[in-house]
């Protein structure tokens, strides 16, 4: 049984939440988000708190209701604070620049990689070797960061590539003569 799911999600002031069937809608100062909860999970809004319970006593329902509670908590946090991911670029000649709605990455290929920024995501480049991704939906922010990182993941010998801030890269030793 999930311990995460037992705790209700408190809806802070300035945020409105509504539950219609299996859809949870949350509206706050930064925007509006919605999430469709799985059919094996019951969702209720009572006294400014969203509670999540398994509908059946099956292993699947018990596994899903902790996930559903975490998703609803992410909706509330997203519309109040938002989410941010930071990426670092390491390597000679590796850099990032913003061009309108596109992020242009020079990652050692014969061509520059152009990434189109999706709706609801704001990307800033404070330095040519740093990328900040900000948005209200944690899944979209994480997906954008993972897609940008996948263009040139860090390699274990020199550590060159795109990595998350404070990510540990397991380094290997080169060949011995």
UniProtKB/Swiss-Prot annotation:
GO CC, one annotated term: cytosolic large ribosomal subunit
Taxonomy, superkingdom: Bacteria
Keywords annotated in UniProt: Ribonucleoprotein, Ribosomal protein, RNA-binding, rRNA-binding
GO MF term (any one): structural constituent of ribosome
Biological processes per GO annotation: cytoplasmic translation
Alphabetized Gene3D superfamilies for the sequence: Ribosomal protein L6, alpha-beta domain
Function: This protein binds to the 23S rRNA, and is important in its secondary structure. It is located near the subunit interface in the base of the L7/L12 stalk, and near the tRNA binding site of the peptidyltransferase center.
Similarity comment: family membership: Belongs to the universal ribosomal protein uL6 family.
Xref: NCBIfam families: L6_bact
PANTHER family hit by this protein: 60S/50S RIBOSOMAL PROTEIN L6/L9, LARGE RIBOSOMAL SUBUNIT PROTEIN UL6M
Assembly, per entry: Part of the 50S ribosomal subunit.
Record-given protein name: Large ribosomal subunit protein uL6
Organism: Rhodopseudomonas palustris (strain BisA53)
Gene name in the database record: rplF
């Amino acid at each position: 049984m999930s311990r995460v799911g037992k705790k209700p999600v408190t809806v802070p002031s300035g945020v409105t939440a509504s539950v219609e069937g299996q859809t949870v809608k949350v509206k706050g100062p930064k925007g509006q988000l919605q999430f469709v909860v799985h059919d094996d999970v019951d969702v209720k809004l009572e006294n400014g708190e969203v509670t999540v319970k398994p509908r059946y006593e099956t292993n699947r329902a018990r596994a899903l209701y902790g996930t559903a509670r975490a998703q609803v908590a992410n909706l509330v946090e997203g519309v109040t604070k938002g989410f941010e991911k930071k990426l670092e670029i390491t390597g000679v000649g590796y850099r990032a620049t913003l061009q309108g709605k596109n992020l242009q990455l020079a990652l050692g290929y014969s061509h520059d990689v152009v990434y189109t920024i999706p709706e609801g995501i704001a990307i800033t480049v404070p330095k040519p070797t740093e990328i900040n991704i900000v948005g209200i939906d944690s899944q979209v922010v994480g997906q954008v960061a993972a897609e940008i990182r996948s263009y040139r993941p860090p390699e274990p010998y020199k550590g060159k590539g795109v990595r998350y801030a404070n990510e540990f890269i397991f380094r290997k030793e080169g060949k011995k003569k």
